[in-house]
Amino acid sequence: MIVIVDYDTGNTRNVKKALDYLGVNNQLSADPAIIMAASGLILPGVGAFKEAMKALNQRQLVPVIQAFAATGKPLLGICLGMQLLFDRSFEFGETAGLGLIPGEVVAIPTDSGLAVPHMGWNTNSLTQPDLFAAVFADQATYFVHSFYATTLPQFTLATTDYGQPLTSIVRRNNVLGTQFHPEKSGAIGLAGLKKFKEMTEDEALSRD
């Protein structure tokens, strides 16, 4: 069963609806025992990094998510949930993240003249081969964000162009993230969630 971390971030229900539509066994939960027993974990998120980390800390979920990642089972962060996977964010001051992928979250530059937040459909360009990211290769997905992750090339699977390349898919072993919302990205987003479900059933895929 896939567990969606329930910590009042806004888009948990949309992720659940998408998994329900696919017929994927899933559950919303903040219970550490249920989270640790999951075959895969999804960390969604909408809003500010600082408030999201505060909510996770209040529920004592930070060490639980870190422990789940250490099991080697697939973990997927979505939008703000992807940003939380990194070491820190500079949104409204500096805030420590989960530290599961090296890197920082910084503001999208405004000197390109493009509107911030980056909102709407944009294409993903793969930067290295990966079975999960391949689903989204040269495909448009739905973005809503004002900050983006900066990380090492080996952890960047895809970027999207918005005045400059912005990180759109990341991976470190079994820990993955999408800056876009697969649950709001139509058929291609559903295909990505289906691929994540397949990863929870095949240990080799979770290490790809």
Swiss-Prot record:
The keyword Lyase applies. The active site is at C79, H181, E183. SUPFAM superfamilies: Class I glutamine amidotransferase-like (SSF52317). One of its GO terms (biological process) is L-histidine biosynthetic process. IGPS catalyzes the conversion of PRFAR and glutamine to IGP, AICAR and glutamate. The HisH subunit catalyzes the hydrolysis of glutamine to glutamate and ammonia as part of the synthesis of IGP and AICAR. The resulting ammonia molecule is channeled to the active site of HisF. One of its GO terms (molecular function) is lyase activity. This is Imidazole glycerol phosphate synthase subunit HisH. Its EC number is 4.3.2.10, 3.5.1.2. The keyword Cytoplasm applies. InterPro entries: Class_I_gatase-like, GATASE, Imidazole-glycPsynth_HisH. Residues 1-206 form the Glutamine amidotransferase type-1 domain. Gene3D superfamilies: 3.40.50.880. Heterodimer of HisH and HisF. It is found in: Cytoplasm. Keywords: Amino-acid biosynthesis, Cytoplasm, Glutamine amidotransferase, Histidine biosynthesis, Hydrolase, Lyase. Its main location: cytoplasm. GO terms for cellular component: cytoplasm. It catalyses: 5-[(5-phospho-1-deoxy-D-ribulos-1-ylimino)methylamino]-1-(5-phospho-beta-D-ribosyl)imidazole-4-carboxamide + L-glutamine = D-erythro-1-(imidazol-4-yl)glycerol 3-phosphate + 5-amino-1-(5-phospho-beta-D-ribosyl)imidazole-4-carboxamide + L-glutamate + H(+); L-glutamine + H2O = L-glutamate + NH4(+). The gene is hisH. Pathway: Amino-acid biosynthesis; L-histidine biosynthesis; L-histidine from 5-phospho-alpha-D-ribose 1-diphosphate: step 5/9. It comes from the Bacteria.
